[in-house]
Amino acid sequence: MKDLSEAKQELIKSLVKNKKFHQLEFEVNSLLLEKRSPFLLNLLGVSKISKVPTSKEDLNESLDLFKEAYLKDRTLIDALFNYAEISIRLLKYDEAKDLLIEYLSKKKYDYKATLALARIHFYLGNMNDCLINYKKIIDNNEANSKLWSAFLFTTNYTYKYSQKDYLNFCKKYSEKLEKFDEKIIKKFQYEKNPKKIRLGFFSADLRTHSVAKFIEETLKILKKDNYEIIAFSNNKLGADDLTTERLKGIFHEWYDIVKVNDLDVVNLIRDKKINILFDLTGYSTGNRCEIFKNKSAPLQISWCGYCNSSGLKEMDYLIADENLIKKEEDFNYTEKIIRLPKIWNSHYLISSEIKINELPAIKNKYTTFGSFNNYGKLSDETIETWSLILKNNNSKLVLKSSVHDHQLLRDNIKNKFKKNGIEGEKIIFMERLKNYDDHLKMYNNIDISLDTFPFAGATTTFESLWMGVPTITLSGEIFNSKFGLSINKNLNLDTFIAKDKNDYIEKAKIISSDINKLSQIRYSLRNLAINSPLFDNKDLGLELCKILKDKWRLFSQQNKNL
């Protein structure tokens, strides 16, 4: 900037201040004809990404500009941060990762660089490295609510922290959440003995999402059973879709709260006389923990969207089932546990018209294992175990993810398998498909599904079973590591539940060797699933209706003076 004339400096300052980025881009481009200074290169990059609208070409050009600026002047740290940010948006962060690591190796700590590196590791599926960087930010007392939530959510993907550690982290985060002054919060408006108990449902996923697949039919049962159901939707702007419209037709009332501040949401929920408020988000994206920290409803229940403890003392209950959380395991959760007698969730019935094809192994002469789980769930232990299976079997592995699928991530996964002795031709990546029926038909390429651990699959396991593909699962110690256990138990498929990694490997070997039995299972599994609790929405809904009435009755008896 100091190399410019005083008039040019004032012009650029004015353009930046008034957000005239198109004109700024023109001015900087003309100056660069004389001298490609790092400052001007970075400024041109900023002008390109600040324009409205910003094109893909602008983003790609800015990426090159930020990189050139930083490599010319390693003291221009803003250029590095800008380069990292745009590289994440464009999924081109291999070089940015190396530059951030190099920068941080010379500097004890830097918030922006550490955060960018954590995000890159997350998108590459390096969850332990992601957690290391998140933890550095937390230890330096620079973690905001969004980062804390991301950290807590990510701990579910690895064995890095115990459940005891996790609960301690939750407690620390809870202490940082804003507790509103009672003077500005409206008093509870609920009726103790209402004709209809009013149930509130908070979620950021009332759209085409796994959460909707599990709650839609249950909501209909609750509605029929004399409950009033009210939605508090935190769907991000533009995310509403046909599923949203369908859900709106089920709820008695619907409130979009994504642009409403937490205090006003708390008061809104109290105004609406909500008796029981469900959190369907937990620490997932779009959460609003302050709403529950400030006790928006007299009873608050965590269910479906986040299957671990919230760690909030204000959260009264967590819904699980008899298989997921044994009574002797209650100490792992701050909430009281509501145990549904069969299964914690039931999936809506999928179309029976989707054909189940012949077992691929019959034609292929080898076993095709598969996992359609989020690639972030492919922990180091999972890849190590799957590699041993692939070494010991005439087999291949099909992978597909509905989120965070890009070439750098695939390459990283292949490299992890290669370190475990498995070459790339053994690993087959399938493309993400938008059409749901087409997605389900891809299970016709798989003989046996392999579950991930410690974070097990839920939606993917329901879908796999529907398509006649059984899932080998490893039972863990906490809620979200036992999805496969509960699902298989409800189908009496104990043969597919492994007690440890060696047992998991042995089961894969034995089950894949019996082609005839596997073929029989394939054609009988859908009917078995249809007639099980997995898809019995009515039974689950009625059980929940009864439990909620009991919980409200108990609360009313214990709080007569409220």
Where are these regions (language model features)?
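Short Ser/Thr-rich beta->loop micro-motif in glycosyltransferases that lines
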Residues: 281, 451-457, 475
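A conserved nucleotide-sugar
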Residues: 226-228, 387-419
